[in-house]
Structure formats: C-alpha cells, structure tokens
C-alpha cells in the first residue's frame, strides 16, 4: 500500500480536525468535523464567516493543523500533522461538497455556515502500530518518504 493510501484510509475514519491560521502577527486555532476527499487530498468543513478563524483566513490563507485519535496506549498512537491552504468554497463547488458533508454529518443541516476546503500540501503521519515512532511523509508533488 502506498503512503497516501495508508494516510487517506486513516483520515477517512476520523472526523475532527484542528487547524491554525496566522494573520497580522496573531495565531488562532479551531476544531471542526471534517469530510476527507481522497481524490483531491483535502478536508472539507463548515464554519461561520463571523468566527475569528474565518475572519483571519479571509477567502484563502496558509494553514497548519492536526488530526489525531484518542488511543489508550502509546503503542496505538496515530496522528497527522499537515500544512496546506484553507479557502472558502462558493457556488456549485460549495453545493456539491455540502451534499457529501451532510451525508456524513446529517446534524449539520441546521448550520447555515459556508463550506471551506483545507487543501493538504504536506502530511506527516505518525503510526505507532507500524512500530514506535514510525512516520510516513507525503508531499503534494507526490514525493513520498518513510522515516
């Protein structure tokens, strides 16, 4: 199994992302439920334009973040660190993603918040189930590495 496939399978099983944005010398983090898109290597989420992180992001901004499970033992730790770009989706692109998002999270139907995409450009996946401290690396230009 290639690196991106392994990372993607794990991301598809999770549902909460933490991401951080930077604007004018200020950092801010947020959490949200996400939908993983393996084809585009992206996370989709809903967040209101009035939130601090959305206002700091504007229409598009660099982003970094994490996705991690909550294992009870060190040997089962798995998690992703990433960097990429967050952008607010509009029009038909937003509508199509919203439909898929609502299939995964039906409760979100009550949220009129816009859809955002986090395009993942670099991923580091720690997977202790493959051995303590095992890391898989992926870059958008398709160069994958193992450490």
UniProtKB/Swiss-Prot annotation:
| InterPro entries attached to this UniProt entry | Split_barrel_FMN-bd (IPR012349), UPF0306 (IPR011194)
> Which residues constitute the signal peptide according to the record?
none
Similarity remark: Belongs to the UPF0306 family.
Give the NCBIfam families listed for this entry: PRK03467.1
What name does UniProt use for this protein?
Answer: UPF0306 protein YhbP
Gene name as annotated:
yhbP
């Amino acid at each position: 199994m290639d690196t991106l496939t392994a990372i993607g399978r794990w991301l598809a099983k999770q549902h909460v992302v933490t991401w951080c944005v930077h604007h004018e010398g200020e950092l801010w983090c947020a959490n949200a439920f996400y939908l993983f898109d393996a084809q585009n290597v992206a996370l989709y989420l809903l967040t209101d334009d009035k939130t601090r992180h959305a206002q700091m992001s504007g229409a598009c901004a660099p982003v970094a973040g994490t996705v991690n499970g909550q294992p009870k033992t060190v040997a089962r730790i798995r998690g992703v660190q990433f960097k990429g770009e967050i952008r607010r989706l509009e029009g038909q692109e937003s509508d199509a993603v919203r439909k898929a998002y609502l299939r995964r999270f039906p409760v979100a139907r009550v949220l009129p918040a816009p859809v955002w995409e986090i395009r993942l450009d670099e991923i580091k996946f720690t997977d202790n189930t493959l051995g303590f401290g095992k890391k898989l690396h992926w870059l958008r230009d398709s160069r994958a590495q193992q450490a």
